[in-house]
Amino acid sequence: MEPLATTLCPQECTQTTRNETPNETTWSSEHVTKYTYISISLVICSLGLVGNGLLIWFLIFCIKRKPFTIYILHLAFADFMVLLCSSIIQLVNTFHIYDSTLVSYAVLFMIFGYNTGLHLLTAISVERCLSVLYPIWYHCRRPKHQSTVACTLLWALSVLVSGLENFFCILEVKPQFPECRYVYIFSCTLTFLVFVPLMVFSNLILFIQVCCNLKPRQPAKLYVIIMATVILFLVFAMPMKVLLIIGYYSNSTDASVWKSLPYLNMLSTINCSINPIVYFVVGSLRRKRSRKSLKEALQKVFEEKPVVASRENEVQFSLPL
């Protein structure tokens, strides 16, 4: 089993450098595969870095800080970290300048950002679900700094999980067993028995509540981006986590198991890159007659306007627009 850093490029990448006198046809085919993959990955990462960088800038300097935007800001930082570290690894594979320290830190922070994104998306889903089920509590009794405290705790949890995964499994040429297996039992429990079920269940409740309460109106934009972001994460980012757990937990040395890792990593970078696009597209909906700037679109999608309505002398809160 090879370290993760050496498997984040198609298998042809390492085969070519190890063969000193490869056949010309084979050499050409391997290099085409290698540089095509790296080029596409770098383009995706570059676009994602620009998009998340703009999103971070707008959220810090241009958009009023709200509970939900705090989560989105931290999620953008996590996505930016994943994209930056993935770019570094691809550049190392391109120029064959293998610095073990640089690559080790790049892999560490990439996994760190990935885990943080998973944790933050779960927190976002759960909180918005609570805001639908208990609107009065959310608007009146929610702790003022709950988002900041939650993000801090989730970053700390990601430090613990990522540190254990990297120390015992990912950065080792021969992962330390049974320690590595215990680490991935812990990671697997957190991921598939805690965070993913909470994420899916919260979004299912959110979807049902939005559809039932807003008929025949369209769903609130805020909830659309939450559900879209979660679906994209489950489709594009989760497969890499599943492969890592299967590979390291089973101590697999089968090359076929790791052959798909580079492409799953590419899907993960697509997930990190597409989130700002989702925010802008959803924020621009229903604006057919006027063009809205990026700032205006983001302000529209992140705004939360509790509307007070009276029915039988009771105060009810409508969903944010």
Swiss-Prot record:
One of the Pfam families matching this protein, by short name: 7tm_1
Keywords: Cell membrane, G-protein coupled receptor, Glycoprotein, Membrane, Receptor, Transducer, Transmembrane, Transmembrane helix
Membrane-side (Cytoplasmic) residue stretches: 57-71, 127-147, 210-225, 272-320
Record CDD domains: 7tmA_MrgprH (cd15110)
Residues carrying sugar: N23
GO process terms (BP): G protein-coupled receptor signaling pathway
A GO MF label: G protein-coupled receptor activity
Entry's transmembrane regions: 36-56, 72-92, 103-126, 148-168, 189-209, 226-246, 248-271
Places the protein is found: Cell membrane
Segments on the Extracellular side according to the record's topology features: 1-35, 93-102, 169-188, 247
Keyword Transmembrane helix: yes
Signal peptide: none
Membrane topology value: Multi-pass membrane protein
CC annotations in GO: plasma membrane
Purpose: Orphan receptor. May regulate nociceptor function and/or development, including the sensation or modulation of pain.
PANTHER family tied to this protein: MAS-RELATED G-PROTEIN COUPLED RECEPTOR, MAS-RELATED G-PROTEIN COUPLED RECEPTOR MEMBER H
Family designation: Belongs to the G-protein coupled receptor 1 family. Mas subfamily.
Protein name according to UniProt: Mas-related G-protein coupled receptor member H
Gene, per the UniProt record: Mrgprh
